[in-house]
């Protein structure tokens, strides 16, 4: 069986001096290898082909047959690595907490422990007849959430 660690090392070698970053590598028991990469400005098919060929040049099909799939972390898919949070600062995201609360807002900040989303809430000021929209920052730790993903808007 092909080791995940081996594939990760090969991908990291290809990533040197490139603006891409590794999102995930999975290797199934039947040696299906799936590599997900991402880039702040999107992933180009030519680069996926180049990475695929690079991986194939480092693995020996004569020793062990495998299936290889190289692609981008899909738009609208949950974030898997911190770099995805950094790349989406200033953009709208959707968050689902482990408590089942779903909200959307603008990703304001992120670090290794937490991230901040600016959400709009309706608040009725004292003496006012109607509620007003107010922006409020909500902070989450990564352990508090089921997922965060880029919110695709067609407005």
Curated annotation (Swiss-Prot):
One of its GO terms (biological process) is translation. Belongs to the RimP family. PANTHER family: RIBOSOME MATURATION FACTOR RIMP. Pfam families: DUF150_C (PF17384), RimP_N (PF02576). Keywords: Cytoplasm, Ribosome biogenesis. Its main location: cytoplasm. The keyword Transmembrane helix does not apply. One of its GO terms (cellular component) is cytosol. InterPro entries: Ribosome_maturation_RimP (IPR003728), RimP_C (IPR028998), RimP_N (IPR028989), RimP_N_sf (IPR035956). Gene3D superfamilies: RimP-like superfamily, N-terminal (3.30.300.70). Required for maturation of 30S ribosomal subunits. This is Ribosome maturation factor RimP. Coiled coil: none annotated.
């Amino acid at each position: 069986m092909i080791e995940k660690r081996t594939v990760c090392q090969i991908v990291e070698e290809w990533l040197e001096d490139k603006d891409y970053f590794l999102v995930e590598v999975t290797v199934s028991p039947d040696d299906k290898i799936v590599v997900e990469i991402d880039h702040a400005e999107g992933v180009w098919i030519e680069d996926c082909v180049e990475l695929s060929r690079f991986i194939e040049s480092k693995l020996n099909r004569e020793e062990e047959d495998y299936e290889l799939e190289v692609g981008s972390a899909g738009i609208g898919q949950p974030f898997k690595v911190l770099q995805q949070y950094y790349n989406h600062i200033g953009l709208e995201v959707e968050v689902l907490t482990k408590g089942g609360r779903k909200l959307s807002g603008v990703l304001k900040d992120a670090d290794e422990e937490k991230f901040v989303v600016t959400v709009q809430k309706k608040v009725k000021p004292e003496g006012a007849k109607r509620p007003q929209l107010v922006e409020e920052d909500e902070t989450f730790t990564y352990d508090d959430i089921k997922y965060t993903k880029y919110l695709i808007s067609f407005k």
